[in-house]
Each structure stands twice: as C-alpha cells, then as structure tokens.
Amino acid sequence: PTVLSFVFANCQTVCPVLVRNVTRAARTLGPGTVNIALVTLDPWRDTPAALPELAARWTLPEGSRLLSGEPENVCRLLDTLQVARERDLKNGDVSHVPLVMIVDARGRIVYRFSNPPAEWIIEGVRRVRSGS
C-alpha cells in the first residue's frame, strides 16, 4: 500500500504533525511494508530542486517520495483527488485539511482520513495488506 498525503514546506501548523504521524506509522510498520508519497500543496515554492533539502529536514523514511512539478499539473492532480485547499496570494500559504489517503496496489483509495493519528494509519495499512 501507499500512504499519500498533502503538505508544504512553509506550513507551520498541521503539516509538521501530519509528516510526523505518517513517518511514525511507516517506521512502526517497518521497511518495505508501505510506500510514502507526499505531494506538495505549494508547487510555486516547493520546487523539485527544493525537495531533497525538505526530505532531509523532515527525516523521511528511506524510499519516501516528495512530489512536486509544474503548478498547473500539481493543481490538476490535487483537484482530481479532491484535495480541498485555498492559497493566500499575499503570502503564498495554503489553508488545507490535514489529509491522508491509503491507496492499495491497484491504485484505489481505500481510506481517506482527516488528521489521523499514526495508529489509524498503521491500522489502515495493515487492513489493506491483509485484504480486509
């Protein structure tokens, strides 16, 4: 399974907690058990070139993916996944729900959580892995 979440580097509120919970879940589940993919909500500042520094700062587990790209492409993906957000054009910050999705091997979104503790993520991944 893949744990998919949506964050941005300059977020000082929910993103650090979200990243911490996703990271804790992945480490508890163990290497090779789950894929982590974090999609930026701020592709204007979180450019592909900035992502390695961000991954190091967040101490993401080995194999985690931070994803960005052209703003129009990232926004299209976020819209397709129904990720609600609002960008403040004055300071660039993004108001958003702390969303985590668990995606199965077929690419189906099996769970969609708002601000889940690590334990919910762990249980969701275990259920997806077991097929229940």
What are the language-model segments listed below?
Residues V17-L77:
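Structural microenvironment flanking redox-active thiols in thiol-disulfide oxidoreductases
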Residues T13, A49, C75-R76, E119-E123:
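Alpha-helical elements of the RecA-like P-loop NTPase motor core of helicases
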Residues F6, R87-D88:
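N-terminal post-signal-peptidase region of extra-cytosolic proteins
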Residues V3-L4, I36, V100:
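Hydrophobic beta-strand anchors of alpha/beta hydrolase catalytic cores
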Residues P1-V22:
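Short active-site neighborhood of thiol/selenol oxidoreductases, capturing the structured segment around
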Residues F8-A9, V39-W44, L60, E70-E72, ...:
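Solvent-exposed coil/turn segments that connect beta secondary-structure elements
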Residues D88-S132:
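Thiol-/selenol-based redox modules, centered on thioredoxin-like
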Residues E62-S64, C75, L81-R87, D93-M101:
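Structural micro-motif
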